[in-house]
């Protein structure tokens, strides 16, 4: 949503009848202890005071690649259904897709507006294990996680489009796909070269 976390900015106060998601800027894709994903989090200093990359158990990786600490995305920013916090254990991109497909199922008999705001491929970098395996050939871990997140989102958008097709709504639906970021700096996996800016 990212339009503000205070009650006056909640989607219900801006014309929406249903809401599933989070209201602040970002969110972890799975809750701690981050089971089923490879997680890379930014840290100013690694355990032991070193720089570079530190690999822990269960796919948790700390990196000084940005020179700052990853914000606590989930603090005071729960996943909510309607106005009530819910515990979501499914990878967030998949959970948002599940809810979108369910929404289409429940509203396929009348016009609707579905605003689906994925947080992928925004940080934190958390790639689902199944997608990480698909990109095992990518040596650079940052890029591998990014590719896993992007492929997951691509499949998820495909699932929403397939539901529209299955429901007979494909030819009577306007679809807008927007991204709030260009390619991030090299530290976050990509480059826009030979173009300038990000």
Located regions from the model:
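Short beta-strand segments
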Residues: 113-117, 176-179
């Amino acid at each position: 949503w990212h339009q503000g976390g205070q009650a006056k900015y909640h989607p219900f106060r801006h014309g929406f009848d249903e809401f599933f998601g989070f209201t602040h800027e970002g969110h972890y894709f799975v809750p701690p202890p981050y089971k089923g994903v490879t997680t890379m989090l930014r840290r100013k200093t690694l355990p032991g005071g070193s720089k570079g990359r530190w690999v822990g158990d269960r796919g948790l990786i700390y990196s000084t690649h940005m020179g700052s600490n990853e914000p606590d995305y989930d603090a005071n920013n729960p996943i909510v259904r309607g106005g009530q916090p819910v515990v979501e254990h499914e990878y967030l991109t998949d959970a948002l897709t599940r809810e979108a497909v369910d929404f289409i199922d429940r509203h396929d008999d009348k016009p609707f507006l579905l605003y689906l705001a994925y947080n992928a491929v925004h940080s934190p970098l958390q790639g689902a294990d199944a997608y990480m395996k698909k990109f095992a050939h990518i040596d650079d871990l940052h890029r591998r996680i990014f590719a896993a997140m992007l492929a997951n989102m691509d499949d998820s958008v495909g699932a929403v489009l397939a539901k529209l097709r299955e429901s007979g709504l494909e030819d009577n639906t306007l679809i807008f796909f927007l991204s709030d970021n260009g390619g991030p700096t090299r530290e976050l996996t990509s480059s826009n070269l030979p173009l300038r800016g990000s």
